[in-house]
Amino acid sequence: TKGFFMRGGREMDNHFEVMWDTFRDVPSIETPGVSVLDEYYWLNKHDPNYSLCRATVKCGKDAHTDKKFTLDKESAMALSKLFLTTEEELEDKKISDILPDSFWSTNFWLYWQTMFAFQRWSSALEMKRYLCRYVHHIDGLPDFSALRFTKYNQYESMILPLVKYLEAHNVKIEYGMDVKNVIIETVGDKKIAKQIVYVKDGKEQTIDLVEDDLVFITNGCCTDTSCYGDQTHAPDLSKIKNGAGESWDMWKNIAKQAVHGEFGNPDAFCSDVEATNWMSATVETSNEEIIRHIMNICKRDPREGKVTTGGIVTVKDSTENWYLSWTINRQPQFKSQDK
């Protein structure tokens, strides 16, 4: 049986300035006369997000993280040093190269790794960037009180209104295009995109760019080569190969044009699938026994249409193997969901 699926959830906040500056001009498709930003703001003002149980142990018992970071002095000092270390000093280093062994047993690491999908072998430079970008989240990290969520899944609450807005303004959206390369010309100290190379319907084609064109690309995507399964079929992983994927291949072709490595090294991020992949599942149920277990853990009724878990609930005693977390957003999460 096939149902709904979401590869993950977007953890948003009020300081996604670029995104919200965009959506303040995008009309809601549900409430006439207001913007997507208006909807989002009013919803989270009326129904603020926070978690009542951040982690569990022993089959659903509260792990009592109690909003504490449990950082010892050595870990706290190392974390502060990481925040202040220059990016150049962190290149090609793992988090485990920077932080002490005592850090891995702290609540801070439990919160951090499960919220942002970090592993001990993840990039120390990337962790520093996250620390700097979300420093205002630190106080709300233990209970997700810094986060905001949309009413429905992000496709229906954000992407669909944006697509309808663009189409209403005669923007043509091309689907089914596999972008192979962006030809970049170096003029003095400037890098100028001159041409997009893509494949559509098996045929390689190009788009010539002019001075007023803006080009936005995703140079490497963590969901590239995603595979899907359902209730009776496991995902087919046989075609996934280290270093392969449409966005990664494009980045590699762009990187080849660099004179001094200025377009980065994609191989550093996509050469070990086992270290970077993950599995997610979307479950739809009306089973009363399951709902009772959910209510015992998160102290809220998911059928009320309000914040339920308030973010992920991590099964703390699974972190040595599965790193299993689960979440229930406002219901219904999909407009076509059964009541």
Regions found by a protein language model. Name each.
Residues T1-I29, V36:
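Glycine-rich FAD cofactor-binding loop and adjacent beta-loop-alpha segment at the N-terminus
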Residues V18-D25, Y111, S157-A168:
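Amphipathic alpha-helical segments that form well-ordered structural scaffolds
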Residues S28-H136, R148:
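Rossmann-like flavin
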Residues N49-Y50, I183-I184, T223-C227, E320, ...:
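Short catalytic/ligand-binding loop motif for oxyanion handling, primarily in non-cytosolic enzymes
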Residues A55-T56, K61, F269, E274-K339:
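Conserved flavin/dinucleotide-binding core of flavoenzymes
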Residues Y111-Q119, H137-G140, I217-C222, K339:
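Short loop/turn segments at strand-loop or loop-helix junctions that form parts
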Residues C132-L214, N219-G220, T232-H233, S238-I240:
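Helical element adjacent to the flavin cofactor pocket in flavoenzyme catalytic cores
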Residues V199-R303:
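Glycine-rich loop(s) and the adjacent beta-strand/alpha-helix scaffold that form part
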